[in-house]
Amino acid sequence: MQVIETLADGLKRELKIVIPAADMKARLDERLVDAKDKVRINGFRPGKVPMGHLKKMYGKSIMADLVNELVREKPSEILSSRGEKSATQPAISMTEDEQEAEKILSAESDFEFTVAYEIIPAIELKANDGIKVTREVVEVSEDEINEQILKIAESARTYETKKGKAADGDRVTMNYLGKVDGVAFDGGTAEDAELVLGSGRFIPGFEDQLVGVKAGDEKTITVTFPADYPAANLAGKDATFDVTVKEVAAAAAVEINDELAEKLGLESAEKLKEIVKGQIESQFGNVTRQKVKRQILDQLDEMYKFDTPAGLVDAEFDNIWRQINTDLAQSGKTFADEDTTEEEAREEYRKLAERRVRLGLVLSEIGEKAGVEVTEEEMQRALFQQLQQFPGQQKEILDFFRNTPGASASLRAPIFEEKVIDKLLTEISVTDKTVSKEELLADDGEEETETKKKAPAKKKAAAKADDAAEGEEAAPKKKAPAKKKATEADAE
């Protein structure tokens, strides 16, 4: 077998693989000998079929299998012997000439094929002790704990029927029928709907007009759907709702005591506070980690500059661009609304894709050199978390991860990345800084990359993809589930 390098340009490589016809014939004869004792042909006893007859009947199909095996197996063997790793699946090309293909299948001509690929660049790791990060720490106050407990308590708050007029904080139970231009619309009708006045769950103006109603009242409410309302047929439209009030109920007082804790399944208020404090600390800790991770990645980005495989960048850009267009479609906005053009957006996100690929390669190299491994237990836990996100679709999800090439890598990658970050945190300089909750949660423009400073609106569009790869926080984006009732869709 000959391996001839026909292209070496930057990260691009192209190899011509030549397997002599004599070698192909020897491989074919070996397979025919093996098949001789297995095939059953009328007129011949087992194992007594002449080789010539066997070759005539099965030679080409066996040779076709051999060709497929060689194309499937040889590229990885050759790259390994060259000390190279392909960034993406190598592209294989063979002759398209039918006569030449016939000669190859008959072992009359050398079998040649071409392997084109991009190599993963060699990365010379640098010392990590020059990386310095600030870890923001929030001390959880008693007020913060009590505030969170009150929110929990309010979600389980009880209500008692009242005879008077409804006020802010009261719960109104009602039937309603919504109309636009006098015609009822889908999602605008409900019976026994419960609404706490002042909660902001319904579209603007709806709740305000219920203040002062009593049980048994009938009232027509007039509102205007927001211009950015998710349902295009209702956006900006005036609507009326014929409301029948069935009950007005006042909220029972909420106190943080043992009785409340018992309602929540705990033995005491102290235990409740302990659990809530732990939850808050965990939430703050997650934000802190993301901000620290961002600092680490930004510094690694400055430390390592090298060409990235175009195939990986293209794939990463496609993922980001798909997310952007999905978000724009859901919001009904255009690039002009985001104060940019499609061309500018493509340029900015191409830079982001290159950064993400470069950092991914650096983290991978750091992890491999440090012996970072993802355990089977960690993979199973990640898979279980995926299954929990799609109730009722467990079988489909399992089949996807079992049968889709590369699917398991999507589970492994984030685990591996976090373990590499953990490793780096033991080697770099970390300075703790006590801050307030507001300071921790505030967007820090100075920590944004230059790419994102130029396009703050676009950052939101790809926030989900960006956070997953780089741990960079972005402002949460309000979205309304498509199936939510029309009166509620704009509120949560």
UniProtKB/Swiss-Prot annotation:
Keyword GTP-binding included in the entry's annotation: no
SUPFAM superfamilies membership: FKBP-like, Triger factor/SurA peptide-binding domain-like, Trigger factor ribosome-binding domain
Class of the enzyme per the UniProt entry, highest EC level: isomerase
Molecular-function GO term, any one: ribosome binding
Any one cellular-component term (Gene Ontology): cytoplasm
Subcellular location field: Cytoplasm
EC annotation from Swiss-Prot or TrEMBL: 5.2.1.8
Catalytic activity: [protein]-peptidylproline (omega=180) = [protein]-peptidylproline (omega=0)
UniProt-listed GO biological process terms: 'de novo' cotranslational protein folding; cell division; chaperone-mediated protein folding; protein transport; protein unfolding
UniProt keywords, alphabetically: Cell cycle, Cell division, Chaperone, Cytoplasm, Isomerase, Rotamase
Domain PPIase FKBP-type: 169-254
Region described as Disordered: 77-96, 439-492
Similarity comment text for this entry: Belongs to the FKBP-type PPIase family. Tig subfamily.
Function as written in the Swiss-Prot or TrEMBL entry: Involved in protein export. Acts as a chaperone by maintaining the newly synthesized protein in an open conformation. Functions as a peptidyl-prolyl cis-trans isomerase.
PANTHER family from the UniProt entry: TRIGGER FACTOR CHAPERONE AND PEPTIDYL-PROLYL CIS/TRANS ISOMERASE (PTHR30560), TRIGGER FACTOR-LIKE PROTEIN TIG, CHLOROPLASTIC (PTHR30560:SF3)
Domain notes for this protein: Consists of 3 domains; the N-terminus binds the ribosome, the middle domain has PPIase activity, while the C-terminus has intrinsic chaperone activity on its own.
Protein name: Trigger factor
Species for this entry: Agrobacterium fabrum (strain C58 / ATCC 33970)
